[in-house]
């Protein structure tokens, strides 16, 4: 029996992403289903963990070829066509995290150079949505800014800004605007939390709002440990995984995998390994793929989906735990000031 610390344990997840990926490089949730840019990138990151450099590059080239003039992407595509006119800031920013992750693993700058103009346009779009308070509005639709911000989305953007700044430095470009944006965003996330969820019910009931500031490096050290410990009993079901929403009896594999990364980031590797081990029971024995989630009150998988982004999240969590690649510390380091990490 293959152990979970052996990469072959995850080969079916890698192969699944490859099967779903279209010839144009796009990676939808499932075969012939919708695509969103964030999850497309998450799946592409799973590909590069598995050493699929050509296929991962193809996924980034799809982004290059489908970028809007303002630097953004639409939030949803079906069969290559936009299915929504909304443009979400964290979806657009995530290209930076994906590209930096790719660089850490491939050890060359070719894709960074090829994609730099795409990245630059994307980051300009993102920081154009930043308010004077430091938060970044969550979306734009029909040229109108949707005036509210998300803790999870802004935490993800914070990590993407860190990765983008690192790319700019590696390639010799000025990144002062991005660094200022990152500093303002962090200050807002830490000190001005009333800027978030102003126009809707608080998202604190979602586990992502709990662990994302830790996973993405906004909150560190003892404060990060206290944050995770403080709501652990609310979100984590022993022997099962992490709930998506605090009041729902539903553990989800992607959120649980991200929580694994957050635990590794705060030095709780044994706890991360225990949590990760619980997740493998949620694979379909027919094809060895992970379901989206499990409703334990009904003892049913729901929804009846096996998304590529769940496969990608599992691959990233496995890498953070077992260090299969040189990208395993992607979420464990603050890269902006680490010139020593440049790979010649």
Predicted regions, residues:
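Well-ordered alpha-helical scaffold segments within catalytic/enzyme domains
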Residues: 1-3, 41-53, 94-111, 156-173, ...
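Extended glycan-interaction surfaces of carbohydrate-active proteins
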Residues: 2-34, 57-87, 116, 121-148, ...
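N-terminal beta1-alpha1-beta2 module of alpha/beta enzyme domains
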Residues: 20, 28-29, 33-41, 45, ...
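Short, surface-exposed loop/turn segments at secondary-structure junctions
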Residues: 28-31, 78, 109-113, 172-176
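Short hydrophobic/aromatic segments of transmembrane alpha-helices and their interfaces
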Residues: 38, 94, 118-120
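Alpha-helical positions within canonical tetratricopeptide repeat
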Residues: 54-55, 111-114, 118, 176-177, ...
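Extracytoplasmic catalytic/substrate-binding loops of multi-pass membrane glycan-assembly enzymes
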Residues: 91
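Active-site neighborhood of glycoside hydrolase catalytic domains
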Residues: 151-195
């Amino acid at each position: 029996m293959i152990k979970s610390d052996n990469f072959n344990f995850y080969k079916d997840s890698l192969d699944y992403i490859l099967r779903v990926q279209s010839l144009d490089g796009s990676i939808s949730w499932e075969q012939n289903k919708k695509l969103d840019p964030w999850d497309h990138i998450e799946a592409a990151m799973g590909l590069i963990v598995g050493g699929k450099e050509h296929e991962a590059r193809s996924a980034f080239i799809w982004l290059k070829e489908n970028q809007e003039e303002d630097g953004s992407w639409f939030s949803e595509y079906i069969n290559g066509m936009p299915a929504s006119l909304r443009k979400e800031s964290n979806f657009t920013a995530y290209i930076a995290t994906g590209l930096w992750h790719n660089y850490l693993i491939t050890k060359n700058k070719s894709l960074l150079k090829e994609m730099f103009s795409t990245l630059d346009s994307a980051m300009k779009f993102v920081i154009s949505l930043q308010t004077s308070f430091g938060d970044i509005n969550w979306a734009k639709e029909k040229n109108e800014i949707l005036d509210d911000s998300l803790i999870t989305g802004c935490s993800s953007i914070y990590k993407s800004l860190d990765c983008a700044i690192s790319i700019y430095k590696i390639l010799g470009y000025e990144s002062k605007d991005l660094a200022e944006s990152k500093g303002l965003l962090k200050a807002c996330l830490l000190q001005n939390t009333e800027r978030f969820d102003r126009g809707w019910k608080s998202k604190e009931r979602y586990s992502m709002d709990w662990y994302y500031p830790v996973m993405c490096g906004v909150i560190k050290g003892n404060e990060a440990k206290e944050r995770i410990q403080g709501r652990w009993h609310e979100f984590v079901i022993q022997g099962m995984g992490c709930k998506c929403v605090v009041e729902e009896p539903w553990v989800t594999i992607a959120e649980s995998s991200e929580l694994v990364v957050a635990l590794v980031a705060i030095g709780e590797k044994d706890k991360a390994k225990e949590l990760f081990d619980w997740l493998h029971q949620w694979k379909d024995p027919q094809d060895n793929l992970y379901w989206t989630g499990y409703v334990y009150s009904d003892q049913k998988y729901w929804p009846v989906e096996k998304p590529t982004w769940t496969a990608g999240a599992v691959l990233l969590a496995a890498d953070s735990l077992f260090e299969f690649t040189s990208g395993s510390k992607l979420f464990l380091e603050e890269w902006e000031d680490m010139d020593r990490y440049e790979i010649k």
